Amino acid sequence: MDELTYQIAWTCLYPTRLRTIKQWLEQYGSASAAWERLDVEGKKAALDRAQQEREWIDKHDISTYFYQDDNYPYRLRECIDAPILLYGKGRLRVNEGKMLSIVGTRQASERCKSLVRQLVLDLKEMVPDITIISGLAYGIDVAAHRAALEAGLPTWIIPAHGLDRIYPTLHRDVAVQALEKGGILTEYISGTEAEKLHFVARNRIVAGLADAVLVAESKQRGGSLITAKMARDYDRDLFAFPGRPSDDSMTGCNMLIRDQKAQLIENARDLVNAMQWDPVSQPMQTSIFTMPEDITAEQKKILELLQESEDGIHVNLLVMETQRPYSEVAADLMMLDMMGTVKSMPGGVYRMKVES
C-alpha cells in the first residue's frame, strides 16, 4: 500500500480528531510509519475503507492534497484546524493568484445578487488572477459562482460532502461548468452525505483558503456569520456590503460593520483598494460623447457631473450636488437612461454611456 492509502486511513479512523492525527504524524514522520505503531479498535476497518477510497480516487481522476505536501493550499495550512487531506476535482491551481470567498444568505435579494455579480465582473477587469470561492448553496453562494463563470474566472466549490455527489442537485450545471477552469475541493471521502455539522466544518475551509472574505448579505444569526468569525480567527480580511437599517436580511452585515469586525465596501474598487492589490492598467481609450440637444438644463447639469467621474455617482450625491428633490433627479436619470446617455448600475450608482 502506498503512503496516500495510509493518509486516507487516518482520516477514516479519526475524522474529527485533527490534532491527534497531526501529533502522531509529526512524531513518527509519515502516515505509514505512525500507522504501524497504532494499536486501537477499528484500525483494520479504517484501512479497508481507505483502500476502497484509493481505488475510487484513481478511477475518477481525483487529486489529493496532504497537509505536509508542497501542493497543499498554503493559506489553509496556516490554520490550526486545517484538514489533514483534501480531495479535488477539476483544474485547481491552489497556490496561484488571489483568493476571494463570497458568502451570504440562501434567501438572497435580487439587489445583493446583482451587487455580487457586478463586483465579480469588475474584479475580472481589475485583478484577472483572482479566484472566487463559495459553497454552491442557494442564494449568494451560487450567485458568486455564476458571476465567476460569466466573467471567465476560476471558481472553487467547497461542499459539505464527498465528490461522488452534488448538493443541491439543482446546481449541478454550475458545478460541471466550474470543473472547466476551477473545481471542487472537499475534505470528505466519497459516500459522505451533506450533514448539518459538515456545513459548519466546511466553512473553515471557505474562510481559510481565502485572502479575503466578503459577507454579501446576512441576518444577525445567519450561517455566514460563522464563516465571518472563522475568517477573523484566521486573520483574514473581512468585508461586508452595507444595507438599510430596515433590511432584515442585512442586519448581520450591518452588525459586522458597526462593530468594526468587517470593512464596508460597495464595489470592486473598494475591495481592491482595501486589499492594496495592484489593478491591471486598462488601455487608454478616447471617449466620444456629444451632449444631446433636446435636454433640459437640469439634465445637462447631471450629465456634466457624471462626465467628471469614471466610477459613476450615487443618486443621493447627485441630489446633493444639484440641490434638487430626489424625485426630480430620479426622473431625469430615468429619462437620460432611456435616451441611452447614462447607465444605471447596482446600488443606485449612475455612469455615463460613451462610445470608444
Language-model-derived ranges and their functions:
Residues M1-L4, F66-S356:
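Glycine-biased, small-residue-rich flexible motifs in mid-sequence functional cores and linkers
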Residues M1-N71, L256, M339-T341, P346-G348, ...:
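Short, small/acidic-rich helices and loops at N termini and domain boundaries
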